[in-house]
């Protein structure tokens, strides 16, 4: 009896010895030396990597940004109010990543891709790194497809292509966000995914944008990533990279995406705050030395992919705010040098009632007519030149008392052209409507119409063509060319409308 009991015990002991795992699990840990202002200094964490996520005892997560000889500087992804001096921290061995899926369409999320619209969790099956490398030279192809904004001034003279980075720059309250939201509204039915990233904006401004998109049915193809002004600097710093990761998910699935960063100057300010608190040496305007790299690595992820990768695209519209028109400040010049052109919005034009307040003279698209359909190239070719000559003449005419007839005619034509470029907010126009408008203006058909009546005449002409002569729209949409037949139909419609007007 005693022997069998002893055998059982020895068998159990033998089994336990066999099952014993001799592997030692090494955990990279450290101790909090100091915490405050969204920054923690950690002693230990000897093997931590730059950019690695670290986890505090009470659950807060941070990113190791400064690796110094005696300690590690960590930025907190939260308020960190429960972190105490002396508490333990462990390195996770991971870098920041977010879940991605089709389920994000129509949702409002924060910089960690967590929903903040109160509509429940988002089901996801895979994840992407927040910071992923930009496509290489071989992975890209040149921009050739237009991305229509619905704004005549942009689509005719400063065209944007799929895969381009076009900066929207101007003083505060000049309609920069309105240009971006109008572009989103114009993508309805284009099978294009839009991502709007709000960095350090007022919560009321973000709510207004979301409401506009919902009312117009644009939220179903849009994702809003929002970190408002009261968010920690770390989350404001991460928000644009999160937006880029979400857009990349669709781009690599052979889809077209549009991402709007509103705005990188607030992003740079959040990064400056983090850097100064981490005691990194300040440079120009107290920004750290790598603030150019901050934006270049973000905007270089924008691409038109090669046919081997499925020809997906990601187009970016960063919005930068200037102080009293000073485009030579640090952040504006940085972003101008990274992007493929800029749309300059002028406070003077805005106050003069010219909206969108686009200064066509100093706005430029470095992709140019490659991002226009043939029909638009045919009619819009001389529009920019005529407007430039008009602006020059107008400045001269202020000092001249008696002008000859030709100059007076050119001034009158210019005033009518400028009237054509005015558009109401949230009322984007189709390419066909834009072609009608530009052709009518540049071919002297409006010279006999009073300036105050120009917009009314054009609206009626567009409606007349849509209802009475639908063949015009069919020709443009099917051939993408302003054919002789289309021109004949348009001329006929203008004559008929002139008689009715």
Curated annotation (Swiss-Prot):
Its main location: plastid. It is found in: Plastid, Chloroplast thylakoid membrane. The record marks 363 as: Required for activity. Keywords: ATP synthesis, ATP-binding, CF(1), Chloroplast, Hydrogen ion transport, Ion transport, Membrane, Nucleotide-binding, Plastid, Thylakoid, Translocase, Transport. Its EC number is 7.1.2.2. GO terms for molecular function: ADP binding; ATP binding; proton-transporting ATP synthase activity, rotational mechanism. It catalyses: ATP + H2O + 4 H(+)(in) = ADP + phosphate + 5 H(+)(out). It comes from the Eukaryota. GO terms for cellular component: chloroplast thylakoid membrane; proton-transporting ATP synthase complex. It is a peripheral membrane protein. ATP binds at residues 170-177. Belongs to the ATPase alpha/beta chains family. NCBIfam families: atpA, PRK13343.1. F-type ATPases have 2 components, CF(1) - the catalytic core - and CF(0) - the membrane proton channel. CF(1) has five subunits: alpha(3), beta(3), gamma(1), delta(1), epsilon(1). CF(0) has four main subunits: a, b, b' and c. Produces ATP from ADP in the presence of a proton gradient across the membrane. The alpha chain is a regulatory subunit. This is ATP synthase subunit alpha, chloroplastic. It comes from Pisum sativum.
């Amino acid at each position: 009896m005693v022997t069998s009991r002893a055998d059982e015990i020895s068998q159990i002991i033998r089994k336990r010895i066999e099952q014993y795992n001799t592997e030692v699990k090494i955990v990279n840990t450290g101790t909090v030396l100091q915490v405050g202002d969204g920054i923690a200094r950690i002693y230990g964490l000897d093997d931590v990597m730059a950019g690695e996520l670290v986890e505090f005892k009470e659950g807060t997560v941070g990113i190791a940004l400064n690796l110094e000889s005696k300690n590690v500087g960590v930025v907190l992804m939260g308020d960190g109010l429960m972190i105490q001096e002396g508490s333990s921290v462990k390195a996770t061995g991971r870098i920041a990543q977010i879940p991605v899926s089709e389920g994000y369409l129509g949702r409002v999320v924060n910089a960690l891709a967590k929903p903040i619209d109160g509509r429940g969790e988002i089901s996801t099956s895979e994840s992407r790194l927040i910071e992923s490398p930009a496509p290489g030279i071989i992975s890209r192809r040149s921009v050739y497809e237009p991305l229509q904004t619905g704004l005549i001034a942009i689509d005719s003279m400063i065209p944007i292509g799929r895969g381009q980075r076009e900066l929207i720059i101007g003083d505060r309250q000049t309609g920069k966000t309105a240009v971006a939201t109008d572009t989103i509204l114009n993508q309805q039915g284009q099978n294009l995914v839009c991502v709007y990233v709000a960095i350090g904006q007022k919560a009321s401004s973000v709510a207004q944008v979301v409401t506009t998109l919902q009312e117009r049915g644009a939220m179903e193809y849009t994702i809003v990533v929002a970190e408002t002004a009261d968010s920690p600097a770390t989350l404001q710093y991460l928000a644009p990279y999160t937006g880029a990761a979400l857009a990349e998910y669709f781009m690599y699935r052979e889809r077209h995406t549009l991402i709007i960063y509103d705005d990188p100057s607030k992003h740079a300010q959040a990064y400056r705050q983090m850097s100064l608190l981490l005691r990194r040496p300040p440079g120009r305007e107290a920004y750290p030395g790598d603030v150019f790299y901050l934006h270049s690595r973000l905007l270089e992820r924008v691409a038109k992919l090669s046919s081997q990768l499925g020809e997906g695209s990601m187009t970016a519209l960063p919005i930068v705010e200037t102080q009293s028109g000073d485009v030579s400040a640090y952040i504006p010049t940085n972003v101008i040098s990274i992007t493929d052109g800029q749309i300059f919005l002028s406070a003077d034009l805005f106050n003069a009632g010219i909206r969108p307040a686009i200064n066509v003279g100093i706005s430029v698209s470095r992709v140019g007519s490659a991002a226009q359909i043939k029909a638009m190239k045919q009619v819009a070719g001389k529009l920019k030149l005529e407007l430039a000559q008009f602006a020059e003449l107008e400045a001269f005419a202020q000092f001249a008392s008696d002008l000859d007839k030709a100059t007076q005619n050119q001034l009158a034509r210019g005033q009518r052209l400028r009237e054509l470029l005015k558009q109401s907010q949230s009322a984007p126009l189709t390419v066909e409507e834009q072609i009608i408008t530009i052709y009518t203006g540049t071919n002297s058909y409006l010279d006999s119409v009073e300036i105050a009546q120009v917009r009314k005449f054009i609206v009626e002409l567009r409606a007349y063509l849509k209802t009475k002569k639908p063949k015009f729209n069919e020709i443009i949409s099917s051939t993408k060319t302003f054919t002789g037949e289309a021109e004949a139909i348009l001329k006929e419609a203008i004559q008929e409308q002139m008689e009715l007007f």
